[in-house]
Amino acid sequence: MGKITAIKKLKRLYRVDLSDLDEEKIYLCEDTIIHFFITIDKEVSETDLEEILAYDQFAQGKSLALYYISFKMRTGAEVRKYLLEHDINDTDQIEQVLSVLTENNLINDKSYAENFIEGKISMGSSGPYQIKQKLLTKGISNDVLSETLNEIYSEEKQIDVAYKLASKLSRTYGTRLTLKQLKDKIIQNLMNKGFSYSVSSIALDSLELEADEENEMDLLYSELDKVAKRYTKNYEGYERKQKITQALARKGFLYDDISSALRDYTFPE
């Protein structure tokens, strides 16, 4: 049977000196000191010591976890990673900490997902697929994600958010791109932000975009100058016109407009 010979308060922990035991000193948190009534001259067996140290791992883990979640909401996976990074290595103790915090609603992956999704909807910046990928990296399960997205981010809301993004893109690029280029850009941008092709198309159609013929021709002649300069170096005659026509068509210009522009175009020497 061993004995506690001294207790010294340090910055964060208590140093406890022991006699007649395998350990000469141990470091405990205040919660452990109180839980086991640790006092000088208290007798402690090796079995008692194992129980004290096991509880202290849990107590320190809980203290660290509470500190970590005090700044903002965290997922269970984030707390688990944080504890491992801070030398709480007993997986059973970690799971016990997570269980206690979850039971007290201090960790709630469903609430975390709800707040995250609602925030993204409010910002109008992300579709469901992008949101899902971000939340998966936070350690939230697929089941929780699918359920929460279905509850909060209906197709109607998705279309509303996508429409606002599409409208903004239209104002930004409307005079710099042809109608086809603009439509392609809007669809691609919306899909990159996590909206389905179906939702992206509905949002685009809702804009009811129309071509500005004068702007389309200005863009065509500007692009024609660049393409003609490139192909005049190696081609001439019919072959040159074919190469230029194909290049401009790939950029979204109409064949009739291209033919009209080429008919009166003076090629560089």
Swiss-Prot record:
GO terms for cellular component: cytoplasm. It is found in: Cytoplasm. Keywords: Cytoplasm. It comes from the Bacteria. InterPro entries: RecX_HTH_2nd, RecX_HTH_3rd, Regulatory_RecX, WH-like_DNA-bd_sf. Signal peptide: none annotated. GO terms for biological process: regulation of DNA repair. Modulates RecA activity. PANTHER family: REGULATORY PROTEIN RECX FAMILY PROTEIN. Belongs to the RecX family. This is Regulatory protein RecX. The lineage of its organism: Bacteria, Bacillati, Bacillota, Bacilli, Lactobacillales.
